Curated annotation (Swiss-Prot):
GO cellular component: plasma membrane
Main localization (coarse): membrane
One of the Pfam families matching this protein, by short name: RabGAP-TBC
Entry's Gene Ontology molecular function annotations: GTPase activator activity
Membrane topology listed for this record: Lipid-anchor
Region of interest (Disordered), residue spans: 350-443, 507-526
Domain of life assignment: Eukaryota
Organism phylogeny: Eukaryota, Metazoa, Chordata, Craniata, Vertebrata
Rab-GAP TBC domain location: 101-293
Low complexity bias (residue ranges): 398-417
Role played: Acts as a GTPase activating protein for RAB5. Does not act on RAB4 or RAB11.
Annotated protein name in UniProt: TBC1 domain family member 3I
InterPro entries membership: Rab-GAP-TBC_dom, Rab-GAP_TBC_sf, Rab_GAP_TBC_domain
Species of origin: Homo sapiens
Length: 549
């Protein structure tokens, strides 16, 4: 038996052992001579969200009791909207009530309607069971999935028991999705998203909700996990413009310290929305995100920059975004209603200025080809290693704002080595005048709204008790993988300047490639288990949990 066969049999046995532990339940791995686990009542230690606390919860305050009464009174309004969904699905009243908060026992049916899970179940009868069984037999990332499942929402009463019912359902969903969508495969963030769905939806409904969330153009979440991250790039470019307009001092400090816009916190925004804040606020922000779509991402990021403005202006270059991810959590360490009120105001302001979404992408955007480097803002200090676009004739028009840029028509195209083509684009009607921003890119896909239909039902209603607490704390450290912009521009620039290409052949050899080799090897080694980059190149180390988890 050769080495390949031995390794294959070992992986198969390891996969079977993991599946068997989940089939046995929460007693898996314990000695057989141990008696039954003593029953422990959590009645006085579980808050209204299902978070288990170490000590008994204090009595309800007057403010908390008022919030509970308000949530109960809103329940009838949401039931009426679900009963007449065709009338309310595109109404302003739905958005207004989403910002005020969904009642807990309405959240499951509303999420199911927003993501249209019932229609997907009807169109694909029995497919989830098939994908789940295939994942059990052939999953390549089952060890990683098992490790992430063990650390997902461990302070929630549903996921507290190792190899318990909800952990088994979460494992099945992730295995099935790995088979259902090989382009995404498995990323660590999917376990947290699926766990949120499992709080209010049954297993199969939670699977189709995850499928719809990543497949919907309205939410554009697959761009954060798929290899072609055009959505992420467009949102980052738009964020750079919005933050520079609303907080010029903050962006000026970033430019001064060589903090590139590509290192912005938008890449880790989804993770922070999942496990960086209290569960109560997480659910309310996800309510808004499911109703509003990707329009909600930019206002949330803008609020975070605004609240953290003083800290950001004091951030040095040494590990800035690793510390920012931890400080970003302090943005939401406040009353839920206050955060949602500021979020609504920011949403209205950006919508009025048409800055809530990036402009539509060009046909070539979103592919695996390298993106052209956007022209720098006025007064911006380029990051080390960056190079401006080749010099051209002086521009006669100021650079248009993203939200109001005129339509552009291609003037000429320049073939580049490797088959890529770069187009010099100009505003329509000014084909003879070069534009100051050459071939600026945007995200992939169109940002149009999708109509909802279908009507589901469900899920469970938890007991209403004390205040919410943070469900767990992470010790996060991250490193950011940046794409060399010199490598992007050099082939196209040399195609237009053959003389410079000849001179560069006799120039002293650069040491950039030698220096970048170990970093590329480290990138490939860190990202090898996944079939796509995790949150636009942001790698987060494993979470640290107390002993016994």
């Amino acid at each position: 038996m050769d080495v390949v066969e031995v390794a294959g049999s070992w992986w198969a046995q390891e996969r079977e052992d993991i599946i068997m532990k989940y089939e046995k339940g929460h007693r898996a791995g314990l000695p057989e001579d141990k008696g039954p686990k003593p029953f422990r009542s959590y009645n006085n230690n579980v808050d209204h969200l299902g978070i288990v606390h170490e000590t008994e919860l204090p009595p309800l305050t007057a403010r908390e009791a008022k919030q509970i009464r308000r949530e109960i009174s809103r329940k009838s309004k949401w039931v009426d909207m679900l009963g007449d969904w065709e009338k309310y699905k595109s109404s302003r009243k739905l958005i207004d009530r989403a910002y005020k908060g969904m009642p807990m026992n309405i959240r499951g049916p509303m999420w199911s309607v927003l993501l249209n899970t019932e229609e997907m179940k009807m169109k694909n009868p029995g497919r989830y069971q098939i994908m789940k069984e295939k994942g059990k037999r052939s999953s390549e990332h089952i060890q990683r999935i098992d490790r992430d499942v063990s650390g997902t929402l461990r302070k929630h009463i549903f996921f507290r028991d190792r190899y318990g019912t909800k952990q088994r359902e979460l494992l099945h969903i992730l295995l099935a999705y790995e088979e259902y969508n090989p382009e995404v495969g498995y990323c660590r963030d999917l376990s947290h998203i699926a766990a949120l769905f499992l709080l209010y939806l049954p297993e199969e409904d939670a699977f189709w909700a995850l499928v719809q969330l990543l497949a919907s153009e309205r939410h554009s979440l697959q761009g954060f996990h798929s290899p072609n991250g055009g959505t992420v790039q467009g949102l980052q470019d738009q964020q750079e413009h919005v933050v520079a307009t609303s907080q010029p001092k903050t962006m000026g400090h970033q430019d001064k310290k060589d903090l590139c816009g590509q290192c912005s916190p938008l890449g880790c925004l989804i993770r922070i929305l999942i496990d960086g804040i209290s569960l109560g606020l997480t659910l309310r922000l996800w309510d808004v995100y499911l109703v509003e779509g990707e329009q909600a991402l930019m206002p949330i990021t803008r609020i975070a920059f605004k609240v953290q403005q003083k800290r950001l202006t004091k951030t040095s270059r040494c590990g800035p975004w690793a510390r920012f991810c931890n400080r970003f959590v302090d943005t939401w360490a406040r009353d839920e209603d206050t955060v949602l009120k500021h979020l609504r105001a920011s949403m209205k302001k950006l919508t009025r200025k048409q800055g809530d979404l990036p402009p539509p992408a060009k046909p070539e955007q979103g592919s695996s080809a390298s993106r052209p480097v956007p022209a720098s803002r006025g007064g911006k200090t380029l990051c080390k290693g960056d190079r401006q676009a080749p010099p051209g004739p002086p521009a006669r028009f100021p650079r248009p704002i993203w939200s109001a840029s005129p339509p552009r028509a291609p003037r000429s195209s320049t073939p580049c080595p490797g088959g890529a083509v770069r187009e010099d684009t100009y505003p329509v009607g000014t084909q003879g005048v070069p534009s100051p921003a050459l071939a600026q890119g945007g995200p992939q896909g169109s940002w149009r709204f999708l109509q909802w239909n279908s009507m589901p039902r469900l899920p469970t209603d938890l007991d209403v008790e004390g205040p919410w607490f943070r469900h767990y704390d992470f010790r996060q450290s991250c490193w950011v993988r940046a794409i060399s912009q010199e490598d992007q521009l050099a082939p196209c620039w040399q195609a237009e300047h053959p003389a410079e290409r000849v001179r560069s052949a006799f120039a002293a050899p650069s040491t950039d490639s030698d220096q970048g080799t170990p970093f590329r090897a480290r990138d490939e080694q860190q990202c090898a288990p996944t079939s796509g980059p995790c949150l636009c190149g942001l790698h987060l180390e494993s979470s640290q949990f107390p002993p016994g988890f």
